[in-house]
């Protein structure tokens, strides 16, 4: 159902408490400040060189660890980007090439994926991130998920102090 598959971010509260953010994710949501930039800023604070080799690698702690295609689709939807509209006869029209606002938003989202302190995920899917136990090992601050999976599908979360927030809006 749409409610059971509502997407958002599972976050490790213990990591979050250590990053020095101004507010909790819940406070950002409550204050209508849970935006893509807020997520990126707090995710960047979540990066930590765990193995001390001064290189960004898979042994480090990252801000966001999820499938880029799954997370990108949620960012696009949450940003109000429309790729298709209707013409005067009601037929679908691909109108992205003429929508500079949508292009600018998509480029901003792409920029987030290029900052390896914010996002660096060697896994191919959210299921892999969870199956590999990255959040259970406290190696990632945020991972995509949905509420119904927190009590059933993501069993490794049983011993992790996690929270859940919706996907952020664009601005």
Language-model regions, residue ranges each:
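Acidic, glycine-anchored loop motifs typical of Ca2+
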Residues: 27, 49-60
């Amino acid at each position: 159902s749409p409610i059971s598959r509502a997407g958002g971010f599972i976050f490790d509260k213990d990591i979050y408490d250590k990053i020095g953010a101004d507010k909790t994710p819940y406070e950002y949501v409550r204050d209508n400040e849970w935006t893509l930039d807020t997520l990126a800023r707090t995710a960047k604070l979540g990066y930590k060189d765990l193995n001390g080799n001064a290189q960004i690698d898979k042994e480090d702690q990252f801000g966001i660890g999820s499938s880029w295609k799954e997370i990108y689709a949620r960012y696009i939807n949450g940003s109000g980007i429309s790729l298709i509209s209707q013409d005067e006869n009601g037929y679908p029209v691909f109108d992205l090439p003429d929508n500079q606002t949508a292009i600018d938003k998509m480029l901003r989202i792409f920029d987030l994926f290029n900052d390896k302190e914010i996002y660096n995920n060697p896994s191919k899917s959210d299921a892999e991130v969870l199956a590999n136990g990255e959040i259970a090992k406290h190696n990632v601050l945020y991972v995509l998920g949905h509420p119904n999976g927190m009590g059933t599908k993501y069993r490794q979360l049983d011993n992790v102090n996690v929270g859940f927030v919706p996907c952020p809006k664009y601005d």
